[in-house]
Amino acid sequence: MTLVFNKSTEALSSLVNVLLQLPGKSSYTEPCTALSNATIGQHTRHIIELYQCLLAGYPAGEINYDDRKRDMLYENDITAAVNLIKEIQLDLDRPDKPVKIMCQTEDNLVFIGSNYYREVLYNLEHCIHHQALIKVALLSIKDIEIADSFGVAPSTLQYRQQCAQ
């Protein structure tokens, strides 16, 4: 399952690369009308927090993605967000094991069986989805180099490569 960890690390690295190119705090925290007034910082925080939920729930084998801290620090401070992303990258590679995903419905707490590797894959797909949204905001900022693969699923990249041959 090294591939899943490598792809997750690559996706997080590409996010860090883009964040470090931002010309200032305002480009990280300024609402983007194309994103329903969400910010790059809000999307970054959301990516971070799902990975945090996964890592925090790993020891007990119970992961609750709804129980996010919603820490404004990572929404407003690029340096703090980048540093935490780097910590997540270092901590992600763990042995596979069964886990339960906790989900609160209107009336009940539901547990869904999964495993750690599957949840790393889920977080990768979630990260890429939010990168695609972040890319919309980035396109309005000058002098930022955005990789063609940023915000694009690996399967889509493979398909595009096959079509180009």
Model-identified regions with their sequence ranges:
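Hydrophobic alpha-helical segments and helix-packing faces
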Residues: 8, 36-40, 44-47, 74-81
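Short, contiguous alpha-helical
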Residues: 29-67, 109-151, 157
